[in-house]
Structures are given as structure tokens and as C-alpha cells.
Amino acid sequence: MKASAALLCLLLTAAAFSPQGLAQPVGINTSTTCCYRFINKKIPKQRLESYRRTTSSHCPREAVIFKTKLDKEICADPTQKWVQDFMKHLDKKTQTPKL
């Protein structure tokens, strides 16, 4: 039993100091943020500020991450029509010059 506990401690210590253990966690570097769940309902357009797509090979699925005016990030399914419409809306909004 003591040998098993010692082996477990050794393995955990080795894992903690391995290159993978020292890598940044998913979500700290914006280029590797992954979405594991998508919002089920539409977000009011007026609350949205911007969006970005996640296409990292480290992520299980492609996603669109909407950023709200309150600085929240919301994951959405890019295959949903409303998500595509909102992306087009935000694209037009950013292309329109402000006077």
C-alpha cells in the first residue's frame, strides 16, 4: 500500500513538471480558446459587440465566440442560421464608417 502511494506521488510530481503540465491552460491564450457547449437561444443583437471564430486543431469543434458589450464571451454553433446572420450583422456594423 505504501509503495502504491509513493508511486502515485512520484507520477503526480512528474506530471506537474512535464512540458504539458507547464503549458498554458485552454482559454488563457485567445487563439486556443475552445467551446465545449453552445448557447441554445438567440442573444439580443444589440448586446453584441464582436465575434471571433475558433478553428484550432486542439478544440473538439469549430465555434463562434460572441463578445457582448458587458465583456462576456458566449459560445455559439456556427452552423446555426441565427449565428451566421448575427455574424453578417456584426461584419456590416464594423465596415460602416462612424461619423
Curated annotation (Swiss-Prot):
Which positions are glycosylated? N29
Nucleus among keywords: no
Spell out which residues are annotated as carrying Pyrrolidone carboxylic acid.
Answer: Q24
* InterPro entries with a match to the protein in the record: Chemokine_b/g/d, Chemokine_CC_CS, Chemokine_IL8-like_dom, Interleukin_8-like_sf
PTM entry text: O-glycosylated.
Q: Does the keyword Glycoprotein apply?
A: yes
Q: Which UniProt keywords apply?
A: Chemotaxis, Cytokine, Disulfide bond, Glycoprotein, Heparin-binding, Inflammatory response, Pyrrolidone carboxylic acid, Secreted, Signal
From the record, give the cysteines joined by S-S bonds: C34-C59, C35-C75
Which SUPFAM superfamilies does this one have? Interleukin 8-like chemokines
Q: Which Pfam families match?
A: IL8
User: Which GO BP terms sit in this record?
Assistant: antimicrobial humoral immune response mediated by antimicrobial peptide; cell-cell signaling; cellular response to ethanol; chemokine-mediated signaling pathway; chemotaxis; cytoskeleton organization; eosinophil chemotaxis; inflammatory response
Signal peptide residue numbers: 1-23
Q: What GO CC annotations are associated with the protein?
A: extracellular region; extracellular space
Q: Where in the cell is it found?
A: Secreted
Q: What is its main location?
A: secreted
Cross-referenced Gene3D superfamilies: 2.40.50.40
Organism superkingdom: Eukaryota
What GO molecular function annotations does the UniProt record carry, in alphabetical order?
CCR chemokine receptor binding; CCR1 chemokine receptor binding; CCR2 chemokine receptor binding; chemokine activity; heparin binding
Instruction: Describe, as the record does, how this protein assembles with itself and its partners.
Output: Monomer. Interacts with TNFAIP6 (via Link domain).
Q: Which family does it belong to?
A: Belongs to the intercrine beta (chemokine CC) family.
Function of this protein?
A: Chemotactic factor that attracts monocytes and eosinophils, but not neutrophils. Augments monocyte anti-tumor activity. Also induces the release of gelatinase B. This protein can bind heparin. Binds to CCR1, CCR2 and CCR3.
Q: What is this protein called?
A: C-C motif chemokine 7
Give the species.
Answer: Homo sapiens (Human)
